[in-house]
Curated annotation (Swiss-Prot):
Annotated protein name in UniProt: Methylenetetrahydrofolate reductase (NADPH)
Effect noted on mutating residue 196 to D: In MTHFRD; reduced methylenetetrahydrofolate reductase activity; reduced affinity for NADPH
Family: Belongs to the methylenetetrahydrofolate reductase family.
UniProt-listed Enzyme Commission number(s): 1.5.1.53
Gene Ontology MF annotations: FAD binding; flavin adenine dinucleotide binding; methylenetetrahydrofolate reductase (NAD(P)H) activity; methylenetetrahydrofolate reductase (NADPH) activity; modified amino acid binding; NADP binding; protein-containing complex binding
Primary role: Catalyzes the conversion of 5,10-methylenetetrahydrofolate to 5-methyltetrahydrofolate, a cosubstrate for homocysteine remethylation to methionine. Represents a key regulatory connection between the folate and methionine cycles.
Reported effect, residue 82 to W: In MTHFRD; reduced methylenetetrahydrofolate reductase activity; no effect on affinity for NADPH
Cofactor(s), by name: FAD
Length: 656
């Protein structure tokens, strides 16, 4: 039975556990364990490769380098998210000695790779060089990588500073030394990749001598090889045969470089000391000032090369040197049929690839549109909910004090946000209009589309289309929705809009609606909710901590679940009243941090946003009768009707 509302029907404070966000170090809970939905979440990279090799399923992977600026870091993380949609098996991040690569700077190799794993859910290889580094430095970098959740290292010697190679006293001089050290110090924790040179390393005495060095690296513990770029398939085929003859049996992945510009080609060739075939030079030289023409030629060349490699049966996958660009590589993969935007999701929310989160399969619904924030606020947990959220009075969410961490920043710059949300606001209705335009996809009066809100930096989720008309109607009237889901009763898990999990299952949802609204509307809503008491769970809270709910105090409400062959029921999304009090701090702060601070202090626009922050309520509603038609729209309609109904005194005044 649903509990009676705690708090009065008018909006008086009920402050128990309401205002503080806390920052305890771990979540104390005992969790039921359920079988994982996605086997790849529990496999290390070399196991994923082995399974693909056995099945004949080709993979692709992508290389990126750390950006030079903070803005570049924000853009690169956005690119990770976009390119993750195509299904890379892994990415790798290069090690730039000049850029303080092991530091906590947002442009460091370590931080970019950590962000890819933790916040983008990408299996990631971190390059690491031993050139000009002491043993203690290298070991420290490896321990830090492990602590950040990185499990794959590409062990490289690195390029010398200047033209001449100088040995480092107390350090390592060759990649094989680094491989041996990783295995000696960390055992089997890391999967190790090493570089192969299809034409031999430019500093090697001979091709055969270089192959012997490669064999030494594999014998020391390397799990697979990624090659330097090359331009002709026969170069790779000869290399693979030579490796086989040498007794090298691990996977060898060819490195592919789609030519994207004349200057980038010259720079890469200079660094790699490779010779470009004359027939390629003959094509590029006349069009060297036409970037589009060179890019198109590079795409055609890469597609042809990849087709020849794949047809040989010698290639387990393809590794692309992207130069931090996406267009050419994406186009090549699409033409090869390897870019697969599978709408199916292992779970309804974005995954992290950190090893300690591999069992995680339950989250509160509130962070559905801010998964990176949720991961940040729970990064100190020692274990993660698996099977059920559980009863907990202390979810221990870390505080979100810095809204400008590069992986949490809006992808849109200030100028673009002002064009979307308004250079100047004149009333609360101006704010309502922004929400409506975000939902409708129509441009504002200045011709700019609203593609994000402070609570959602992405386009609308596919399932929002099922509720679009209702959402538009209520947002026009000051019910400012930031999260919603329709009720679902047994849709196939393969459904392209609401499906998730393995095939052959069925998914279910309770209708959910979360929104900001004025105090007057909240008071009317509470009056209406009395007649829905046994069906609808509600929770209203404002920035001051006034808190009214009819939900059981410490009891989460499962609002998404799935039934799959041979498995227990999975409940990946809950509405948890305790977590909601932590979420409300973040949700209210976003009014100011993301929107209000776009305007000058004391300006009318800033004042309007501040008023909403100070006076509105954050509300969530759950319709527990998921097999029936969603009643939440009727609840809202009844509320608006009550709000607009003339008062008794007004009617008496108007009477003749």
């Amino acid at each position: 039975m649903v509990n009676e509302a705690r708090g009065n029907s008018s909006l008086n404070p009920c402050l128990e556990g309401s205002a503080s966000s806390g920052s305890e170090s771990s979540k104390d809970s005992s969790r039921c364990s359920t079988p994982g939905l996605d086997p790849e979440r529990h496999e290390r990279l070399r196991e994923k490769m082995r399974r693909r090799l056995e099945s004949g399923d080709k993979w692709f992977s992508l290389e990126f380098f750390p950006p030079r600026t903070a803005e570049g870091a924000v853009n690169l993380i956005s690119r990770f998210d976009r390119m993750a949609a195509g299904g890379p098996l892994y990415i790798d991040v290069t090690w730039h000695p000049a850029g303080d690569p092991g530091s906590d700077k947002e442009t460091s190799s370590m931080m970019i790779a950590s962000t890819a794993v933790n916040y983008c859910g990408l299996e990631t290889i971190l390059h690491m060089t031993c050139c000009r580094q002491r043993l203690e430095e290298i070991t420290g970098h490896l321990h830090k990588a492990k602590q950040l959740g990185l499990k794959n290292i590409m062990a490289l010697r690195g390029d010398p500073i200047g033209d001449q190679w100088e040995e480092e006293e107390g350090g390592f001089n060759y990649a094989v030394d680094l491989v041996k050290h990783i295995r000696s110090e960390f055992g089997d924790y890391f999967d190790i990749c090493v570089a192969g040179y299809p034409k031999g390393h430019p500093e090697a005495g001979s091709f055969e001598a270089d192959l012997k060095h490669l064999k030494e690296k594999v014998s020391a513990g390397a799990d697979f090889i990624i090659t330097q770029l090359f331009f002709e398939a026969d170069t790779f085929f000869r290399f693979v045969k030579a490796c086989t003859d040498m007794g090298i049996t691990c996977p060898i992945v060819p490195g592919i470089f789609p030519i994207q510009g004349y200057h980038s080609l010259r720079q890469l060739v200079k660094l790699s000391k490779l010779e470009v075939p004359q027939e390629i030079k003959d094509v590029i030289e006349p069009i060297k000032d036409n970037d589009a023409a060179i890019r198109n030629y590079g795409i055609e060349l890469a597609v042809s090369l990849c087709q020849e490699l794949l047809a040989s049966g010698l290639v387990p996958g393809l590794h692309f040197y992207t130069l931090n660009r996406e267009m050419a590589t994406t186009e090549v993969l699409k033409r090869l049929g390897m870019w697969t935007e599978d709408p199916r999701r292992p779970l309804p929310w974005a995954l992290s690839a950190h090893p300690k989160r591999r069992e995680e399969d339950v989250r509160p619904i509130f962070w559905a549109s801010r998964p990176k924030s949720y991961i940040y606020r729970t990064q100190e947990w020692d274990e993660f909910p698996n099977g059920r959220w559980g009863n907990s009075s202390s979810p221990a969410f870390g505080e979100l004090k810095d809204y400008y961490l590069f992986y949490l920043k809006s992808k849109s710059p200030k100028e673009e946000l002002l064009k979307m949300w308004g250079e100047e606001l004149t009333s609360e209705e101006s704010v309502f209009e922004v929400f409506v335009l975000y939902l409708s996809g129509e441009p504002n009066r200045n011709g700019h589309k609203v593609t994000c809100l402070p609570w959602n930096d992405e386009p609308l989720a596919a399932e929002t289309s099922l509720l679009k008309e209702e959402l538009l109607r209520v947002n026009r009237q000051g019910i400012l929705t930031i999260n919603s889901q329709p009720n679902i009763n047994g849709k196939p898990s393969s459904d392209p809009i609401v499906g998730w999990g393995p095939s052959g299952g069925y998914v279910f949802q309770k209708a959910y609606l979360e929104f900001f609204t004025s105090r007057e509307t909240a008071e009317a809503l509470l009056q209406v909710l009395k007649k829905y008491e046994l069906r609808v769970n509600y929770h209203l809270v404002n920035v001051k901590g006034e808190n009214i709910t009819n939900a059981p105090e410490l009891q989460p409400n499962a609002v998404t679940w799935g039934i799959f062959p041979g498995r227990e029921i999975i409940q990946p999304t809950v509405v948890d009243p305790v977590s909601f009090m932590f979420w409300k701090d973040e949700a209210f702060a976003l009014w100011i941090e993301r929107w209000g601070k776009l305007y000058e202090e004391e300006s009318p626009s800033r004042t309007i946003i501040q008023y909403i922050h100070d006076n509105y309520f954050l509300v969530n509603l759950v319709d527990n009768d998921f097999p029936l038609d969603n009643c939440l729209w009727q609840v809202v309609e009844d509320t608006l009707e009550l709000l607009n109904r003339p008062t008794q005194n007004a009617r008496e005044t108007e009477a003749p």
